Design a protein with these regions (language model features):
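Adenosine-phosphate binding glycine-rich loop
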Residues: 198-294
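Glycine/serine-rich phosphate-binding loop and adjoining beta1-alpha1 elements at the start
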Residues: 1-75
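ADP-ribose/adenylate-binding Rossmann-like module
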Residues: 170-211
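Glycine-rich adenosine-cofactor-binding loop
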Residues: 66-108
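Glycine-rich phosphate-binding loop and adjoining beta1-alpha1-beta2 segment
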Residues: 106-144
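Conserved beta-strand-loop surface patch within small alpha/beta domains used
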Residues: 300-400, 406-453
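A structured beta-alpha segment of the ubiquitous adenosine-cofactor-binding alpha/beta core
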Residues: 133-169, 175-178
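Phosphate-binding loop/pocket of nucleotide- and phosphate-handling active sites
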Residues: 37-58, 278-334
Length: 453
């Protein structure tokens, strides 16, 4: 048949009494018997009302998808982080039937979590992953399930974590820390990764999405996001509120601070739909939604994602993307015929043994430049570095120096360049960090590292 429909009717009388009314039964000394001898048709049953009833069925995945307007089943996915944002995302996707999810989190529900989490007071002390899976089961009654893994998502050697990631087509980082996305970026065997977070005051949401082939990983997307914060006007207030915590946070993505749950749910709703759209894309994506809390309006900022390159520097790997090189080449060309230069902004992460270049600052106004030399000045430099740190919640700072060589010359370091590198290394040694020197030539780019042993 093309379709099958169910109908139900209610007769408001017990089954035995209905049998008597139909002439099928009779009662004797409070016991019911079949009436085999009665030949008279019974009519008492006609006095009973027959009421039509609606036939309802429990939702399965198909019904949930149809009711939610979801046309694609979604990927086999892993979500790392069952906190405020992660639990909201899973609730939205789970009820709409999108995706087949495993959630990884080692943390427990604490009393203060209840102001911005789907958990209830009865869940205090239970693991977040288990609670989220249980809440999903309560809503879906077995139509779909979320598999909880109580573990550290960064422990890729842990059997349950490794198995979950091996069976996934997509992993979404909602951990609110930097440790997981940076660690995942150096593992080639992992599936495509997205990272999502809400800014500390809840007024913005960020989606970083790797391309389908993982040529542009979360590591470089993070750096390019920071560069946009430093260079774009909207970056001035984007991370405001990161110092207003009541709980010590681990990064600019920590949301353990004073904020209404409504902001989490609003941003989660946007991210849930946008992630579904991003999964269908092959390219990388950096997208920011900035909300005006006074009027509720939202501005969307797209940052073009560009490739990165890795340069081995002894014990550290240096990562720099095409956007940095393009920026420095523009500054070089604008200064012709003179050389130019400035400071390099970025960050070190010794957990993954990396230094990441985010941007270069232009030459201070009191710099001295000629066609064959450059001496960087200091006017406004401290303020510029401080502003970059403020815009990125302290994530980006000074990592070294860059300068250009004149037209027609390569980036090969001169004797003077090597002397400068020694001075840089001695200066950075006070902080226990190596120094980076970047030289921009006509066609090439040289990066040198100096460290005091």
């Amino acid at each position: 048949p093309d379709a099958r429909r169910h109908r139900a009717f209610l007769v408001p009388i017990g089954g035995l009494e209905l049998g008597i009314a139909c002439g099928a039964l009779f009662v004797h000394e409070k016991r019911y018997y079949k009436d085999l001898l009665n030949q008279q048709p019974a009519t008492a049953w006609r006095e009973q009302p027959i009421l039509p009833m609606a036939v309802l069925t429990q939702n399965d995945r198909t019904a949930a998808m149809r009711q939610s307007g979801v046309t694609e089943e979604g990927p086999a996915g892993v979500l790392v982080g069952a906190g405020s944002l992660g639990s909201a995302l899973l609730n939205l996707w789970g009820r709409s039937g999108w995706g087949r999810w495993t959630v990884i989190d080692k943390d427990h529900i604490k009393p203060h979590n209840l102001s911005r989490h789907g958990a209830y007071a009865q869940h205090i002390g239970e693991t977040k992953a288990t609670v989220v899976a249980g809440l999903h089961a309560a809503a879906m009654e077995g139509a779909t399930e979320i598999v909880p893994v109580v573990a550290d998502g960064c422990d890729f050697a842990q059997a349950d974590v490794a198995q979950a990631l091996a069976g996934a087509a997509l992993a979404i980082d909602a951990s609110t820390t930097l440790e997981y996305p940076r660690a995942a970026s150096v593992v080639d065997t992992l599936p495509r990764h997205f990272s999502v977070f809400v800014t500390p005051n809840g007024n913005a949401a960020v989606l970083l999405a790797e391309d389908a082939k993982r040529m542009q990983r979360l590591r470089t997307l993070e750096a390019q996001y920071y560069r946009a914060l430093i260079q774009q006007d909207w970056g001035r207030v984007h991370l405001d509120g990161h110092a207003s915590t009541f709980w010590s946070g681990a990064s600019c993505r920590d949301i353990s601070l004073v904020m209404p749950y409504s902001r989490i749910l609003g941003q989660a709703s946007t991210l849930a739909e946008q992630i579904q759209a991003a999964v269908a894309r092959e390219d990388a994506l950096i997208r920011i939604w900035q909300r005006d809390p006074a009027r509720g309006g939202v501005e969307v900022h797209d940052v073009p994602a560009v490739p990165e390159r890795r340069i081995a520097l002894g014990e550290l790997d240096l990562y720099i993307d095409d956007g940095v090189e393009q920026q420095l080449r523009v500054l070089r060309q604008q200064s012709f015929p003179n050389e130019t230069g400035g400071v390099l902004l970025g960050y070190y992460d010794f957990n993954i043994k990396a230094v990441v270049i985010v941007a270069g600052l232009p030459a201070p106004s009191d710099s001295k430049a000629s066609p064959d030399s450059f001496e960087r000045g200091v006017a406004g430099l401290a303020e510029a570095v401080k502003d970059a740190a403020k815009r990125t919640a302290g994530m980006v700072g000074y990592v070294g120096e860059w300068h250009s060589h004149p037209p027609g010359h390569s980036a090969s370091p001169s004797r003077h360049d090597l002397v400068q590198l020694v001075h840089l290394a001695l200066g950075m040694a006070d902080d226990g960090l190596p120094a980076v020197q970047l030289i921009v030539g006509e066609q090439d780019l040289q990066i040198l590292q100096g460290a005091v042993q």
